[in-house]
């Protein structure tokens, strides 16, 4: 998993999703909420149905966009964007002039989802129509939309916006343009303008400019980022530390000593998130002389700082690092012991392998999986191959992933093992095995992969099925003859899959399926109009009237009060509440924690592959990722299920990409619980 992309395994089953919604009804019927007239419920249901199926229903959208209730008009605008059909542009442009600002903002947001440059002139007009003192949500969303649309026209528009301000005098729109400029990419982003604003009087302006420069990895941004390490503003220091790295300094031909000195100072910063970012940045220099400054932080009171310190010591290496890490190998805290084992292996592969032998024989599969992570770090192929015989598929899958990383693609022995494991009972193992075969495509594997695809139809999640399609696509792309053989032995012989995700992947990797299987859209959601009316009546309408449901997440470190945002993601909230009512999440453990990024769970398997047996479509909304925001983890568009993540801090690069459906409330106490969670900690219960 990438640190920037929370991941959730892929699966879809319309029947299972329908069963979940039906099962929820008796419980949902008991929920309090503001009453809504049935006519409005019907309009909302029609919008939900069209959006969920990704079906451009012009009648439903027109009805919603012209509704007397502005909250309904806002829902219609969001639906138009989520459906993703460019035909919605003509419906949305007039809504930029709606009488209610929140509706205008939703229209701008939706136009950003559609990413069509035809909207840019109208979005610019919306921005310029008011004075700087009147700039609000519609103008800010218009800026974001322009950045998402991008291209040469979007870049020119953002440059014009930035030209309207100066480092000594900025506006909300200018600040928004600074924060969103990274979306343009390194070839179009206004690098010089971003650098100019890093010296702004207002800290809110400085950190936004630095954030985009950091995301762009722009050489011109290296010097401003180094200066930012000494900024009096905590957020600016944190952003600067996040953006610094050896590769960036090398590209700018800068001596790293000033940056390293600045990062070392931040190891004593009062803000834990700043210390974490500084540690992560120091790792990029792989300089063992900094180990002495890092060692004290392995005992930091903040679990995120302590684990990141271990991580960085493993990367920088050296005797001082290993001496500091060895006592951590006996820690009773899972997150601390796990990372210490991996870090020792990074610094001394032999010592790491020796330390992992004991956990590799542990009765608890979680520790055997950690052993696979350690052997991966040590590049211990023989140990990893031994783990392929583990009785638990979760361990086998992790070992096979490690072998995929460290063994050349054409290695005949590993390919032979992959062919055997393609018959394994665990879907995750079969998925990785198929991925291995895709790296070295050969026609000899066609029938084996077709059989794997057919077997995967019965799996509880669809990763193995998708991987088989990807591998067959790689074979088909290897030669015209291979394409013909795949078309004959797979495409023509296989009926159109119900799984939208399989159809979408096949359309991209196996062009012959476009004719044989028909169009990818619309999606068969498994829901009836009555189901959508139920969601609209029980969750969406009350939320539009100001009543949001809450769930309480009891952990080993305390309780998190989570407000569910049904007005932003009604179908997602309905599914989550059903899973909560079924006590689906009780007794699981946080399987992924990345310091100063996210905590993630919702996986009944506990290894990141699991899900509820169905997928839900994205409900991308304008809410931003701030501290304590709850989002749906994905492995690609429209692959949500039960896995969720909670952000430790603001993560603007996730905005508008992952569905936000909740937020931690309760102020500092909630944040304290969130920051205390370590990987492997238990989730005792999630309840209403």
Identify the function of each model-found stretch:
Residues 13-23:
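Bacterial N-terminal signal peptides
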Residues 37, 55, 70-71, 86, ...:
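Alpha-helix N-cap/helix-start positions at coil->helix boundaries
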Residues 78, 109, 144, 160, ...:
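Residue-level signature of alpha-solenoid helical repeat scaffolds
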Residues 38-44, 74, 105, 136-140, ...:
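Alpha-solenoid HEAT/ARM repeat scaffold
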Residues 48, 81, 112, 147, ...:
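Structural signature of alpha-helical solenoid repeat scaffolds
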Residues 53-64, 85-97, 116-130, 151-165, ...:
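Amphipathic alpha-helical scaffolding segments comprising HEAT/armadillo-like alpha-solenoid repeats
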Residues 426, 444-688:
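Cyclophilin-like peptidyl-prolyl cis-trans isomerases
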Residues 29-78, 82:
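N-terminal leader/linker segments that initiate helical-solenoid repeat arrays
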